[in-house]
Amino acid sequence: MKILCLLFAVLLFLFQAAPGSADPLFPDTVACRTQGNFCRAGACPPTFTISGQCHGGLLNCCAKIPAQ
């Protein structure tokens, strides 16, 4: 019975999903994040501006507004 529990634990460990592995990599999302920006649904926070789109146009790419 202990072998069965150990086998079950090993199988769960081997077949667990890695975080983010199911997310498709959209080219616009990769371009946004490589520039140090982030993706957000809806409007960007107050000190950020929309600099493009992410996830095939479903989200906004938010960039920090440069200090003056």
UniProtKB/Swiss-Prot annotation:
Residues 20-25 form a propeptide. One of its GO terms (biological process) is defense response to Gram-negative bacterium. It comes from the Eukaryota. Strong expression in the testis, liver, gall bladder and kidney. Also expressed in the ovary and male and female reproductive tracts. Expressed in the ovarian stroma and the theca and granulosa layers of the ovarian follicle. One of its GO terms (molecular function) is CCR6 chemokine receptor binding. Has bactericidal activity. Belongs to the beta-defensin family. This is Gallinacin-10. It comes from Gallus gallus (Chicken). The gene is GAL10.
